[in-house]
């Protein structure tokens, strides 16, 4: 198979590498971020530094996480200042609490995430939600649409529920395929995640139970909720949550899923 290059770098298809090259998009992203010089900023997957350079020009200290050792070597030669620290690691293995350089400033996360790990990585990052100020990620458009989807939408599902349970999410910018090298098969979007540190609109629930409940509910999403949850809850319990038993999973709000989870929790006397 013929190797593909970008700026003399061998593009690693196994890691889903694509490189942002559109300067207009880069300027738009920097504007959206509205960075302050004192903030704790971590960039995941900096690639060859298309965003890194303008970010490092603004802030006092920047952490980069890059798994490709060849890219790390390039970055080390490009960003020689002590204000940029580079980790040659897989972001999925990182304890982000150890990267909190200023305990008075929560982390801001930025990244052009490989499409093949974006969902898993976001779920991993939610473990550190209490120390995160916000996150801005470039995602495959389909994944972005699933994250921000509302009830009564075919894109609405388990990912929508978990993303929105922890964060206010918003799609901010659509990025065309031609903005990248190599040109991907799909469009991309910038999605903003702002954690609910206070005033969470959803009640605190057992997350493992919410995961189980939504797994049953969306396993066969065309089933009515009475049938899909029959092994967990009866009709009376579903109606108690103000839910029509003829509804389908995609019709239920996150608030309603939380109510069902609470009933399930009490039903089995779980602590």
UniProtKB/Swiss-Prot annotation:
Signal peptide: none
GO cellular component: cytosol
Keyword S-adenosyl-L-methionine (UniProt): yes
InterPro entries the record matches: KsgA/Erm (IPR001737), rRNA_Ade_diMease-like_C (IPR023165), rRNA_Ade_Mease_Trfase_CS (IPR020596), rRNA_Ade_methylase_Trfase_N (IPR020598), rRNA_adenine_dimethylase (IPR011530), SAM-dependent_MTases_sf (IPR029063)
Catalytic activity, reaction form: adenosine(1518)/adenosine(1519) in 16S rRNA + 4 S-adenosyl-L-methionine = N(6)-dimethyladenosine(1518)/N(6)-dimethyladenosine(1519) in 16S rRNA + 4 S-adenosyl-L-homocysteine + 4 H(+)
Top enzyme category: transferase
Subcellular location: Cytoplasm
Superkingdom to which the source organism belongs: Bacteria
Binding site residues for S-adenosyl-L-methionine: 20, 45, 66, 90, 112
GO function term, MF aspect, one: 16S rRNA (adenine(1518)-N(6)/adenine(1519)-N(6))-dimethyltransferase activity
EC numbers for this chain: 2.1.1.182
Keyword tags: Cytoplasm, Methyltransferase, RNA-binding, rRNA processing, S-adenosyl-L-methionine, Transferase
Keyword Methyltransferase: yes
Recorded family membership: Belongs to the class I-like SAM-binding methyltransferase superfamily. rRNA adenine N(6)-methyltransferase family. RsmA subfamily.
Biological function: Specifically dimethylates two adjacent adenosines (A1518 and A1519) in the loop of a conserved hairpin near the 3'-end of 16S rRNA in the 30S particle. May play a critical role in biogenesis of 30S subunits.
PANTHER family, sorted: DIMETHYLADENOSINE TRANSFERASE (PTHR11727), DIMETHYLADENOSINE TRANSFERASE-RELATED (PTHR11727:SF7)
Name listed for the protein in its UniProt record: Ribosomal RNA small subunit methyltransferase A
Biological source species: Blochmanniella floridana
Taxonomic lineage from the root: Bacteria, Pseudomonadati, Pseudomonadota, Gammaproteobacteria, Enterobacterales
């Amino acid at each position: 198979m013929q190797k593909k290059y970008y700026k003399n770098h061998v593009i690693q298809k196994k890691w889903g590498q694509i490189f942002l090259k559109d300067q207009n998009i880069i300027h738009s992203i920097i504007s959206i971020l509205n960075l302050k010089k004192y903030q704790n900023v971590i960039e995941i997957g900096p690639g060859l530094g298309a965003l890194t350079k303008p970010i490092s020009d603004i802030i006092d200290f920047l952490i980069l996480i890059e798994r490709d050792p060849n890219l790390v070597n390039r970055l080390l030669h490009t960003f020689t200042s002590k204000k940029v620290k580079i980790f040659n690691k897989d972001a999925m293995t990182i304890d982000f609490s150890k990267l909190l350089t200023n305990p008075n400033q929560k982390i801001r996360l930025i990244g052009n995430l490989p499409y093949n790990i974006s969902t898993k990585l976001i779920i991993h990052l939610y473990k550190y939600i209490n120390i995160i100020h916000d996150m801005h990620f470039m995602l495959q458009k389909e994944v972005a649409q699933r994250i921000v989807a509302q009830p009564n939408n075919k894109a609405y599902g388990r990912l929508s529920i978990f993303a929105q349970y922890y964060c206010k999410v918003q799609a901010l910018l659509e990025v065309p395929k031609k903005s990248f090298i190599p040109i991907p098969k799909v469009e991309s979007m910038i999605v903003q995640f702002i954690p609910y540190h206070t005033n969470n609109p959803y009640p605190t629930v057992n997350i493992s139970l919410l995961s189980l409940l939504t797994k049953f509910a969306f396993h066969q999403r065309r089933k009515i909720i009475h049938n899909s949850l029959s092994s967990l809850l009866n009709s009376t319990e579903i109606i108690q949550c103000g839910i029509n038993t003829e509804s389908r999973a995609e019709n239920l709000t996150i608030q309603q899923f939380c109510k069902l989870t609470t009933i399930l929790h009490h039903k089995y006397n779980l602590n």
